[in-house]
Amino acid sequence: MLKDIVLVLALQLVYVPILTLRTIFMVKNMSLLAAFMGFLEALIYVFGLSIVFSGKQSYIVMIVYAAGFGARGFLLEDISSKSWAIGYTTVTVNLQQKNQELIHLLRESGYGVTVYTGEGRDSQRYRLDILTKRNREEELLELIERYEPKAFIISYEPRRFKGGFLVASMKKRVKRKKECHES
């Protein structure tokens, strides 16, 4: 019976990351991967329930199943969704002054930055459009906050993009920067 309890708990803890990935893949229109994750999700679900409903002392296993269901969300869901940040984010930063130091640092850190000059209500404003991988968004926001604490920032997920400064260039630039600092 202890083996069943441990197995049910383990199945529940594996179930959440698969459910999270399936949802992410569905939202990103990655149908084949979403379908595969759905298959795994159903397999784990049916297997777990079959263990719960078999045996003489299934009420204990049912409680563990329910507890595992609650614990998995508490322990894993937030962690898995942040660490698997799939895709890209566009961050728009509005500044009162053109901060060349920030712009240079962002580019040296591997971010694609486009700078626009615009007319605000009272004065000229500067807008930075920055494309980054979702898993680097927090790092980017911290960097901006450090250099421009009063910046107005909007981030959103682009549905589609073509051309421009993409990840290959970002990776090359970061790699070159690391090589320069190591030598």
From Swiss-Prot:
GO cellular component, as recorded: plasma membrane
Q: Any idea which UniProt keywords this protein has?
A: Cell membrane, Membrane, Transmembrane, Transmembrane helix
Coiled-coil regions in this chain? none
Q: Spell out the NCBIfam families in the cross-references.
A: PRK04164.1-5
The family assignment reads: Belongs to the UPF0316 family.
- PANTHER family per record: UPF0316 PROTEIN YEBE (PTHR40060:SF1)
Spell out the protein name for this chain: UPF0316 protein GTNG_0803
